[in-house]
């Protein structure tokens, strides 16, 4: 379960800032016991064109990610933002990517997943609001609910609505890394 501080911060993030993101480098089980940040290692191309180690912060593998996700999902359910079934589907999707592409692509998988929550959810939410407005003008209905937008957003993320996002940002890049056409560092940004 999230700590009191975590749920309070999450409430402010979701209700006041209209975001649905937390940093899994610090948002983890037993948040009040966190003494140091979780580290994730990747590689980047240096100014000389050679690969250099890159230290990113976040869960070092999908198992650690799932522990952080479970705290996030509990907070989402506590605040009635997203239903349990959709949150489980999202977690299983990320775990499937990790299983399909392996630890070699974990830094990229986590980067895309974190950016999805930080940046892409806002775009999806905006799209939902725009589609709803257009539907109303045309005398149609739309399932986006401005009073409770995050359910629709996560439904889109785990459904066909955002499959192109995952294909472009994650699947294609992981495939390029796994087939050794590209280096992981070409896609990882600090």
Model-derived segments and spans:
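Short, low-complexity/basic segments of RNA/nucleic acid-handling proteins
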Residues: 1-189
């Amino acid at each position: 379960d999230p700590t009191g501080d975590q749920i309070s911060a999450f409430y402010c993030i979701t209700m006041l800032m209209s975001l649905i993101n937390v940093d899994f480098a610090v948002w983890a089980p037993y948040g009040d016991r966190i003494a140091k940040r979780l580290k994730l290692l990747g590689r980047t191309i240096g100014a000389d064109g050679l690969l250099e180690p890159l230290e990113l912060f976040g869960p070092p593998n999908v198992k650690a990610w799932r522990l952080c996700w479970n705290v996030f999902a509990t907070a989402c359910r506590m605040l009635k933002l997203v239903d349990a079934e959709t949150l489980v589907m999202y977690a299983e999707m990320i775990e499937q990517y990790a299983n399909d592409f392996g630890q070699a692509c974990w830094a990229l998988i986590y980067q895309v997943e974190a950016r999805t929550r930080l940046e892409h959810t806002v775009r999806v939410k905006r799209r939902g609001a725009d589609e709803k407005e257009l539907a109303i003008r045309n005398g149609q209905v739309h399932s986006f609910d401005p009073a409770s937008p995050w359910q629709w957003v996560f439904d889109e993320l785990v459904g066909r609505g955002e499959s192109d996002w995952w294909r472009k940002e994650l699947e294609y890049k992981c495939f390029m890394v796994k087939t050794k056409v590209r280096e992981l560092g070409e896609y990882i940004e600090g």
